[in-house]
Amino acid sequence: MSTVVWTPLGEADLPDLRELALACLRADGGLPQLADESMLRRLFLVGAGIGGRDETGDLVAAAAVRLEGPQARSATGLVRPSARYGGLGRQLAAWCAERAGGTLLRVVVESTSPQTESFLAGLGLEPTFAEHVMRHDLAEVPRVRRPAGMVSLPWSEDTATLFHRAYRASFAERPGFPDPPLGAWVRGLVEDPGFRPERSRVVLDREGRVAGFVTLSDCWLDQVGVVPRWRGQGLGGHLVARSLRAFSRAGCGEAWLAVGVDNPAHDLYRRLGFLDAGLRSRWERAVPGEGDLSS
């Protein structure tokens, strides 16, 4: 069994962290931004981080614990596919539990495999959030006509209120809906450097009432919503198909989205040509102390 040397993570480890993340994404799928420098820095370098290197110097495992609130700590970790099943995962979990105050309470997983799910469940953690990550190659972009009588408007300072109204009307019925006020919601969009207002759309019906909306960033469908009275009439399909054409015209080689595992829109996206490209998830401990690996 090879020897792994553990050392703290730092800026100099970013290239190797990226290569490790890419290896995990190739094996398990998941959120492609996991390999972006900005996300790796946020996940592994903001708090305390540790990396394990084998006898050749390759980074085979990494983990970190960071604060996500006054007392809330989250852990994340990666193990190279070729180095799994040798106990590295349990070593990382024990290290994270110690840094988190003795008990591992919350884990962020942007590249989730069945083995990861089984491992985390064995630690006494339960999934609290999970999304399908989906990809469209844009080779064949469908066309779905907008329902008759509707008007589509791009994002602007004047239409931002309509977008927010459509967002609330589309999602307010969901359990745990956060319902952010207009100002906070708008800032969350426009402060994202990838946000593409010229490609985003809000749709109004004949009476001028909001019927649905879509917000886009780079080559991602961020949010797609249809108000309840307009569901099942092709508006959601139109918003997605129109967005795919916008991505294609902008030079995107592929389009991405993430959708909750229990969201029926998953079937719509598959009918429009999206394919599943992995899972991302969040895990939390149901019973404090259960599965503690710190001792």
Labelled PLM ranges:
Residues L67-S74, V79-M150, S281-R285:
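Acyl-donor-binding surface of acyltransferase catalytic domains
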